[in-house]
Amino acid sequence: MYQNITISGLPGAGSTTLLQHLKLVLKDEGWQGFSGGEFMRAYATEKGYFDPSSGGHHDATVYSDEFDREVDMDMRSKLMSEKKWVLESWLSGFLAQQVPGVLKVLMVCSNKAVRIDRIVNRDAISPDLALANMNNRYEKNLKKWQRVYAQEWQDWVVAPNRVKSSDPIDFWRQDLYDVVIDTYSVSQLEATNIVLNAIKSTQ
């Protein structure tokens, strides 16, 4: 039985939108939602690490490894000890590895142009800036997290034989997730129903 949900996905894949839909649909049943990206963006803006008027989003290198881990491990703690959370962040599915009762959802968009267009509309920036921001954040975040979470990758993913020790650290490997939704061919309403049906199927 699924007691919590994680939603992971790279920018433009629709993970934040899915969180918003699920919060609305599940609120009467006592579910709560948390967006790691929105929390970190507010923190970075408050501390002056990021100027929201500059367009685009910041990358994870603007704050310390310690703060990054603190926020992430708090999410893992919620998944281990609490119920009825929908946690959305780049790494939430990775943080849920080996935690029982968590439905791990990965949002993807197989059409890169569609992802870019969504970021353009979300951030009111040019397609060129959206592409550059998307690629820059991915490269910097992945490099940082591969270093910061190398031991957790070994403990949570390699040791349980989910992947080979020689495989590169890839937090968004589809085989680490319970549900993978391609929002290029699946609408947000359909995506919401897929998740709801997955939860109900185990009740």
Task: Give the positions of each predicted feature.
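Walker A/P-loop
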Residues: T16
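ATP-dependent small-molecule kinase phosphotransfer cores
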Residues: G36-Q98, A113, A124-A132, E139-N141
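Walker A (P-loop) ATP-phosphate-binding motif of ABC ATPase nucleotide-binding domains
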Residues: N4
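Post-Walker A helix-loop "phosphate-sensing" segment adjacent to the P-loop in P-loop NTPases
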Residues: L24-G33
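P-loop (Walker A) phosphate-binding loop of NTP-binding proteins
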Residues: L10
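Hydrophobic anchor at the beta1->P-loop junction of P-loop NTPases
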Residues: I7
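Small-molecule kinase domains that catalyze NTP-dependent phosphoryl transfer to phosphate-bearing small molecules
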Residues: P127-A191
